[in-house]
């Protein structure tokens, strides 16, 4: 996938919650996005010592052997909505996905696979409310990261606060 890091919102870039990742085969299953530290070695979503700045992650990614950069949600004000498999082979978008994107009204990008979307908002992830049908939500306390592409979808370039959409 072509690099679009310049489209990533500045607000997200300001947090030193970045790592790099690469696709690795795990025993015959579909390849998994394995996190790596920008300092070398494995990246851990629960260990800030393995994270770095946006610029460090981009430099590490460009140095080779990595497929992309990722943002860790731990200890941040952001919530990520991950909608998988909602784009059909003709480019059509599932109605539920289109509704979620519209309701969120925040920065949205194509996922690494090109078959789904990531939406990033400011807000708080409700307790126990992480998976809903075809989408999942991650935030502080979820020990997860997003592979960030910068391949923006739509015209919204900023991350907005939208607790109503998160709830």
Residue ranges and their predicted role:
Residues 1-167:
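Conserved phosphate/metal-binding and DNA-contacting active-site motifs used
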């Amino acid at each position: 996938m072509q690099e679009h890091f310049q489209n990533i919102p500045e607000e997200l870039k300001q947090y030193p919650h970045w790592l790099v990742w690469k696709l690795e085969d795990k025993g015959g299953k579909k390849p998994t996005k394995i996190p790596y530290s920008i300092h070398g070695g494995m990246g851990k979503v629960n260990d800030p010592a393995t994270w770095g700045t946006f610029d460090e992650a981009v430099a590490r990614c460009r140095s080779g052997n990595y497929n992309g950069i990722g943002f860790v949600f731990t200890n941040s004000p952001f919530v990520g909505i991950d909608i998988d498999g909602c784009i059909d082979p003709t480019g059509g978008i599932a109605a539920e996905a289109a509704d979620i994107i519209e309701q969120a009204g925040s920065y949205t990008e194509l996922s690494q696979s090109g078959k789904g979307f990531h939406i990033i908002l400011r807000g708080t992830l409700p307790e126990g409310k992480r998976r809903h049908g075809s989408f999942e939500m991650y935030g502080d306390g979820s020990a997860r990261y997003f592979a960030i592409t910068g391949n923006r979808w739509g015209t919204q370039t900023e991350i907005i606060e939208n607790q109503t959409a998160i709830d």
